């Protein structure tokens, strides 16, 4: 009886150690670090769970903001004033997105941001890592602004295929709300 108890305790202890090690190994907070150096220099290092470096970058006078947004996903945002650029990093797969200027919303696979393209102000909805998978332009009579983020009041995904968008329209800056099927 005593042997069975000791054996059971050992098995439980080993399982607990394995679970703790597994959780630590796959804990996203162990995949990144931001160092503050001298003279307003900052260094960001982001690694995959296996330790392989995905990003190692320095910034001067811009403190990068690293956020854990999902089990395997981080964002790195850098900017000041009216313009901020956000990149998404999948630490499991080692994939890094392009930089999105003044991002206003995101889901698990899409991002929403304003952009001035082809002579028009647009709101772009696209796949985070590959615009060839999904890309959608929302073109309206937006309020005239120099910086696109000021025309957007609110944006959020209601589900995988529906976007709520509130923005300013026209010279009078009329508030408009839309539900957009993507």
Identify what each model region corresponds to:
Residues 1-14, 18-20:
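N-terminal Sec-pathway targeting helices
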Residues 29-36, 70-81, 108-117, 161-168:
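Short beta-strand elements that form the blades of beta-propeller/WD-repeat-like
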Residues 41-57, 80-99, 122-145, 171-182:
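Surface-exposed loop/turn elements that mediate protein-protein interactions on large endomembrane-trafficking
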Residues 60-67, 98-110, 144-155:
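Repeated scaffold domains used in trafficking and secretory/extracellular systems
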């Amino acid at each position: 009886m005593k042997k069975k108890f000791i054996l059971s305790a050992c098995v439980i202890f080993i399982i607990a150690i394995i679970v703790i090690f597994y959780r630590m190994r796959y804990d996203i907070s162990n995949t990144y670090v931001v160092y503050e150096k001298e003279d307003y220099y900052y260094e960001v290092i982001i690694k995959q769970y296996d330790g392989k470096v995905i990003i190692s970058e320095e910034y001067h006078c811009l403190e990068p903001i690293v956020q854990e947004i999902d089990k395997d996903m981080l964002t790195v945002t850098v900017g000041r004033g009216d313009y901020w650029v956000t990149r998404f990093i999948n630490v499991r797969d080692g994939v890094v997105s392009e930089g999105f200027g003044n991002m206003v919303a995101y889901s698990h696979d899409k991002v929403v941001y304003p952009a001035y393209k082809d002579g028009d102000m647009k709101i772009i909805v696209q796949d985070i890592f590959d615009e060839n998978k999904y890309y959608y332009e929302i073109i309206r009579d937006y309020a005239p602004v120099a910086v696109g983020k000021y025309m957007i009041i609110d944006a959020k995904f209601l589900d995988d295929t529906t976007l709520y968008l509130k923005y300013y329209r026209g010279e009078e800056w009329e508030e408009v709300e839309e539900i957009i099927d993507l």
